[in-house]
């Protein structure tokens, strides 16, 4: 009987969806509710490449191709077809929502109205030729400044458009209130803010989770360790050529900048999901990152201002570790953190994937303070400029915290770095090819604005003759012994002027590796 009922539902969905599917040239996927008897079922579905989209502890919402329906039934899964993707029932532009053209006009109007604070750029085109718009908000939008970079991205899944509306409203909110609200003026003056309201414009127009090639973009980013096993800075494989166009554009853009904090918006639940989504373990098991405590704190800064989210009965405090909820492969947030050093979280805004337009004002009101508070988190931690002490030029550098395996990186063109940290005392190290590692110990981080520590890196050439040799060692010895006064700082390793500087210069001249944290 169950199989017959499922068959009838499928026939109904297919009949309604047939002409629609032909128009968009996308194979229809079924949205099924699967009874998860144990977590191994959830892991199996993920490993089969199906898009698990929600899990409440008993039932999972899963997107599957047509061919998988009978297969899962034959394997003993209890499931119910609850919809199709694309959906024939949802209007392309329900009342209250912006379609792609209207969104484009909205962004262009903002850029024209606030030319001193904004720049609107295209990151590239989608499969069907639509622009992926990014609006840059800054007090100096044409200048790369010594300040942290932040981004909001929405609607990587085209059937989850409420985040697009919130991104538009948030951009407008910042710009309209810049001249009258000191708090907003502060974040616009001190942060380079980027907003991509619609990452999957084709999917949004077609009312589908996927892009126009039928690919789930949030299951298609390079995955660790299958696609890369080290950071981009250390030569990690970008693995971009085989990616979907929308992913290629986001990856290139992310690596052209130096983002410290990010979030991407979804719907279908109400929770802030923080990394890791996948560390090789099973669903339902915590996969903590090296910055787990920091991430929980940042996630809470969003959730606590959204009362419904914060009071969730499923997710205590409105936050969850990604893998503890359910594992995904190829997600954007893990790629950002593991590959570029940018902390990114996935924020689920509403339990309904495509709420009626009448809900939009309420959802915006519930999330406005959360969006601003989350953005303000990027101003915390430790920051500074890293430069060549002989030339003053910026140095692209890896920044490490003792006891934490996840580095961040400085901006290659500006030289600024920003390391998000909780209040406490930390030992930092700064390393770059061709330079002596530099350490700064006992850095105090307060509950407020970031502590500043600028870092002058040395290649060991302290007499500035273009090479590192015995003459540099001899000069260092004479300065340390007080024989030869010198008006420049030759503390090349950050440990104070002493024998370690001599040893560092010797090692540098002989190309001997120098310990970062002895």
Predicted feature descriptions by range:
Residues 393-423, 442:
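Short, acidic Ser/Thr/Gly-rich low-complexity loop/linker segments typical of extracellular
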Residues 382-389, 415, 455, 462:
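A short, amphipathic beta-strand motif
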Residues 433-460:
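Structured interaction patches on ligand/partner-binding surfaces of diverse proteins
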Residues 465-486, 493-517:
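Alpha-helical segments with a strong preference for the paired helices of cellulosomal dockerin domains
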Residues 423-434:
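A short, solvent-exposed beta-strand micro-motif common in secreted/extracellular proteins
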Residues 163-207:
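Short helix-loop-beta-strand segments that form the rim/entrance of peptidase-like active sites
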Residues 6-15:
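Bacterial N-terminal signal peptides
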Residues 191-196, 202, 210-387, 394-396, ...:
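Metallocarboxypeptidase
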């Amino acid at each position: 009987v169950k199989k017959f009922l499922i068959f009838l539902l499928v026939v109904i969905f297919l009949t309604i969806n047939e002409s629609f599917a032909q128009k968009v040239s996308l194979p229809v996927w079924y949205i099924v509710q699967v009874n998860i008897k144990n977590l191994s079922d959830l892991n199996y579905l993920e490993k089969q490449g199906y898009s698990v989209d929600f899990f409440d502890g008993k039932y999972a919402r899963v997107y599957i191709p047509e061919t998988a329906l009978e297969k899962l039934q034959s394997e003993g899964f209890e499931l119910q077809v609850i919809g199709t993707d694309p959906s024939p029932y949802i209007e392309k532009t329900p009342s209250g929502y912006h379609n792609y053209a209207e969104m484009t006009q909205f962004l262009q109007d903002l850029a024209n109205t606030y030319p001193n604070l904004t720049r609107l750029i295209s990151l590239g085109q989608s499969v069907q030729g639509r622009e992926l718009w990014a609006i840059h908000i800054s007090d100096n939008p044409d200048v790369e400044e010594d300040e942290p970079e932040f981004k909001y991205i929405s609607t990587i899944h085209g059937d989850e458009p409420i985040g697009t509306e919130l991104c538009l409203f948030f951009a407008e909110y910042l710009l309209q209130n810049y001249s009258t609200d000191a708090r907003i003026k502060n974040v616009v003056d001190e942060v380079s803010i980027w907003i991509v309201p619609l990452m999957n414009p084709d999917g949004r127009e077609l009312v589908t989770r996927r892009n126009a090639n039928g690919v789930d973009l949030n299951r298609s980013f390079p995955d660790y360790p299958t696609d890369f096993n080290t950071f981009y800075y250390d030569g990690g494989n970008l693995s971009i050529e085989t990616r979907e166009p929308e992913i290629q554009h986001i990856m290139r853009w992310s690596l052209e900048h130096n983002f410290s904090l990010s979030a991407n918006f979804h719907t279908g639940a109400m929770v802030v999901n923080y990394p890791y989504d996948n560390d090789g373990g099973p669903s339902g098991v915590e996969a903590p990152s090296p910055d787990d405590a920091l991430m929980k704190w940042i996630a809470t800064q969003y959730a606590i201002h959204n009362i419904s989210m914060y009071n969730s009965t499923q997710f205590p405090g409105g936050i969850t570790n990604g893998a503890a909820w359910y594992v995904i492969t190829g997600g954007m947030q893990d790629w950002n953190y593991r590959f570029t050093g940018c902390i990114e979280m996935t924020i689920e805004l509403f339990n309904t994937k495509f709420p009626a337009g009448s809900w939009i004002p309420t959802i915006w009101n519930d999330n406005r303070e959360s969006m601003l508070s989350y953005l303000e988190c990027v101003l915390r931690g430790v920051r500074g400029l890293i430069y060549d002490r002989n030339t003053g030029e910026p140095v692209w550098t890896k920044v490490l915290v003792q006891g934490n395996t996840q580095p961040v990186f400085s901006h290659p063109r500006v030289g600024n770095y920003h390391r998000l940290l909780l209040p406490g005392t930390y030992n930092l190290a700064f390393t770059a090819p061709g330079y002596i590692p530099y350490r700064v110990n006992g850095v105090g981080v307060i509950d407020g604005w970031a502590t500043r520590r600028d870092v002058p890196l040395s290649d060991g050439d302290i007499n500035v003759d273009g090479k590192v040799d015995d003459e540099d060692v001899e000069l260092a010895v004479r300065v340390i012994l007080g024989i030869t006064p010198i008006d420049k700082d030759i503390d090349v390793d950050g440990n104070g002027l002493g024998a370690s500087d001599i040893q560092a210069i010797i090692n540098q001249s002989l190309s001997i590796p120098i310990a970062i944290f002895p």
